Amino acid sequence: MSEERLIVEGKVNGKDAYFLLDSGASVGFLNKDKKKEYGLSEGRRFEGTIIGAGGEMRNVMHCDTFVHFGGKVIPQFLLADISGVVKSIKKETGIEILGIISLPQMSMIGLNLDINSLEVWLE
């Protein structure tokens, strides 16, 4: 956990990784640049349009890889170039994230946030 951001540690294909918890995100992402290192499974092309703080994202793919966190399995990630976010968070916190966990994903696994104290717990 970071004192600046809601960052948690999880596992992907047995490897430890860090994730930003983003209550404003409607979809979760895994960093396309780490596809080989983490064995991220690329599925079909995502047909929708993704627009985030950094602008429109192109070449977004469905990702058939799951994140394991606190004994729970988190599905439904997209594989995209999130290098701008990764660099920004690393500069701010010293932590390199692999991905972003969205609000619907948090809800799916019963993850709760206390924004004021930066505490995270599972139901």
Regions of interest found by a model, annotated:
Residues 1-123:
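Pepsin/retropepsin-fold aspartyl endopeptidases
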